[in-house]
Curated annotation (Swiss-Prot):
Interacts with translational regulator CsrA and flagellin(s). It is found in: Cytoplasm. The lineage of its organism: Bacteria, Bacillati, Bacillota, Bacilli, Bacillales. Acts as an anti-CsrA protein, binds CsrA and prevents it from repressing translation of its target genes, one of which is flagellin. Binds to flagellin and participates in the assembly of the flagellum. GO terms for biological process: bacterial-type flagellum assembly; regulation of translation. HAMAP family: FliW. This is Flagellar assembly factor FliW. Gene3D superfamilies: BH3618-like.
């Protein structure tokens, strides 16, 4: 299947690689189908809408930048995503890419959770947490 993308141009994808977000993503509720596309030679992954070429979120696996990051998924999320164990889960966070890049932040309060076996995804909004929507990727660099 051919799709147009924000960062990769026109590409072929396999329909079995599509991740379905049954409830959409907050702010994009009508967007239900996405594909994960690695950005070559970077730790970044694009969560690309299959239907809207201009909609691509830059993601990272949070543990490289935030080694103590941990979340607990509620029973409702486990059921929605049909998660039976940790081996089912891939966890990402959305970046807000800034200029200069040192000012880039990660949304740790609303991670993207994907059941890699069932190809189901959800952006989970964490409550009762110290995580915020803007955590600097490079905290040792102080914003000017």
């Amino acid at each position: 299947m051919k799709i147009a993308t924000k960062y990769h141009g026109n590409i072929d994808i396999d329909e079995k690689d599509i991740v379905r977000f049954e409830q959409g993503i907050p702010g994009f509720l009508e967007e239900k189908q996405f594909v994960l596309l690695p950005l070559e030679d970077t730790p970044f992954i694009i969560l690309q809408s299959v239907n809207t070429p201009a909609l691509g979120f830059v993601l990272i696996e949070p543990f490289s930048y935030f080694p103590t990051y941990e979340i607990e998924l509620d029973d409702n999320t486990l059921e929605q995503l049909q998660i039976t164990g940790e081996q089912d889960v891939a966890l990402y966070v959305i970046l807000t890419v800034a200029e200069p890049f040192d000012d880039t932040t990660a949304n740790l309060q609303a991670p993207i959770v994907i059941n890699v076996n069932k190809r189901l995804g959800k952006q989970v909004i964490l409550t009762n947490t110290n995580y915020k929507t803007k955590h600097r990727l490079f905290p040792e660099k102080v914003a000017k």
